[in-house]
Amino acid sequence: ERQSKSKNPFYLQLSHYAVHSNIQATKRSLEKYEKKEKGKIHKNAYFAALTEDLDYSVGILLNKLQEFGIANNTYIIYCSDNGAVPTLPPRRKYKHSYNYPLSRGKWDAKEGGIRIPFIVSGPNIEPNSFSDTPVSLADVLPTIADLAGHSSRRQMKTIDGVTIKKVLYNSGIGKVKRKDKGFYFHVPYINNIAFGRPHSSIITGLYKLIKFHDDDELNLFDLSIDIGEQNNLAMEFPRKAKKLESKMERYFKKHKTVKWRNGIDWKYKSIQEINSFY
């Protein structure tokens, strides 16, 4: 409120604890969803109620922007830090994860762990438009800088992300030029709550490759027809799989990425202590 009265541009980040565990909700929302019949996929009344409470909280923020008279001059970026846990409690066996039809969830480089909601509203952005242009949370900072008129600053040229302003201003249509083509995800440790296997992935175009570092197993998926990552194409298209593997390895070497080896524990050792790099 003070910033809106100052007439100066400002940045505000509101990080909700929802929808994180422990799953807790208001009595009002919980009673609403406990009365509903359970669906085939979504059955957790507490999770549904917590999600509605989050929605209510976002509504308070939007109403305040209207009240302060700055709603028409404000960009809002709504997103998550990662996919949901596959199930609760984390070690419980499940048929469909909370991210279904995406596979698995938080801690993994599968789509359930890395594909998240990303919604932007503001001046010059067409309401109800939709984009299938892949973006990353690394793009948020350079995009904000561009929207604020600072896209040419030297610092913006030294970070991983790129501005997506042109896509936002063009009803979600367009491509984004990146220094390193594709998206790279790296899990160089064993997490027994998740896969329990160190792995990395690369997404470029329609294809995604996952490499498991404990035995060099390769999984290749065509995300345009297999968003759930159920049909491994590595045996059918071995040259494609090897090409993506080589591209990913070059990227890790270029950036001196942490390399998995026995004994790496991400919770108790710093990167310097690991002392294993590409």
Task: Please tell me what each predicted stretch does.
Residues K5-L12, I70-I76, T204-Y207:
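Loop/turn elements at helix/coil->beta-strand transitions in domains of secreted/extracellular proteins
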Residues Q13-Q24, Y78-P86, D160-V162, H186-N191, ...:
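Short, solvent-exposed turn/loop segments enriched in Gly/Ser/Thr/Pro and often Arg
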Residues I41, A45-E52, S131-A138, T158, ...:
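Soluble non-cytosolic domains of exported or imported proteins
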Residues A84-A109, I125-P127, T133, A138-N219, ...:
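C-terminal cap/loop subdomain of S1 sulfatases and analogous C-terminal strand-loop tails that border
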